[in-house]
């Protein structure tokens, strides 16, 4: 099964990993407070101590020139089956939105926080999608909140923006 491995750190540290491993498909982005690098592969990763997710639904390919939103969706053991079933069954007509590039639904290898990556041409086209009924009905905090479990989990749903690195 294909997996997505992610690590956060400084730009220089992560960029050195990328430079030293040209045979691996490593993608590096800038976040609000650090950099992130990830590798999507069925092989072993070069990343040390990454977060590991299984890719359970995918559309399109990753590209370092695109903007990404990573949505972290908390759940509990009691709700993961229903959450996963709902997210897998979502009609992927969102791919018809202007600027849409890619999508990944990810199951955690450890824990119960699922992750979704939406790739768009830029942040504005993602924000347009985020204001759509498709997003509000299927991917918003409100749409998914009954899969979170205890009320303390609600604050754990969050988005992290990944920006292309301009050198």
Swiss-Prot record:
Residue ranges of every copy of the ABM domain listed in the record: 67-158
Keyword Phosphoprotein: yes
Residues bearing the modification Phosphohistidine: 66, 79, 154
InterPro entries: ABM_dom (IPR007138), Dimeric_a/b-barrel (IPR011008), Heme-degrading_MO (IPR050404)
Cellular component annotations (GO), alphabetically ordered: membrane
Superkingdom of origin: Bacteria
Keywords on record: Membrane, Phosphoprotein, Virulence
Cell compartment(s), UniProt: Membrane
PTM comment: Each of the three conserved histidine residues contributes to TRAP phosphorylation. Phosphorylation is essential for TRAP activity.
Record family assignment: Belongs to the TRAP family.
Function: Signal transduction protein, which is a major regulator of staphylococcal pathogenesis. Phosphorylated TRAP leads to the activation of agr system and consequent RNAIII synthesis resulting in the expression of several virulence factors. Up-regulates the expression of most toxins and genes known to be necessary for biofilm formation.
Protein name: Signal transduction protein TRAP
